[in-house]
Amino acid sequence: GAHSVQATIAGKLWNNWVERFPVVYSDIFKDAMKNHDISLSYAMAISRQESALEANVQSPAGARGLMQLMPGTAKDTARKLTDINYQSAEQLFEPSVNIRLGTQFLEQVYQQFDKNRVLASAAYNAGPTRVKRWLDESQGKLDVAAFIESIPFTETRNYVKSVLVYDYIYKLIMNNKASGIQTESEFTRLY
């Protein structure tokens, strides 16, 4: 389960992929993502990076739960949904609520940035406004690797790299076709 991630880190079991990348809460993820374009592997990768798949974690900044949602983001996202009764930030520790709101927000930034996981992941971590600013600054002159390296926040830069690799690993674990770390459109786009 989710605690296995921490156990593999403590035990330095770096090659134990199934334990390091558990497929937990998959039914909740699948249910929450019924009308979304994001893949299960991508949503799991975000959750793995955000919380190591621990439901009851809170960041120093106040982000909560599996997908590490800020209460304000959760509230804004819940307003757009009719199938969730979001009343309190404490609900973000409930996997079903956190995953429903987290996958909705992830889908929102994924669509906003033309289904590009590099940009959507950066936006999920640092906010869409910052990503737009970084794109304005790069003026469409950078390939994907240069754009990722140009992200001014070390945390976000590393976050994007980790999420892309984790998505690839989850695709392999879940027996999906994994053709590469980046999609063709992510690789060929200028940023």
Locations of regions flagged by a protein language model:
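Catalytic glycan-binding domains that act on GlcNAc-containing polysaccharides
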Residues: G1-Y191
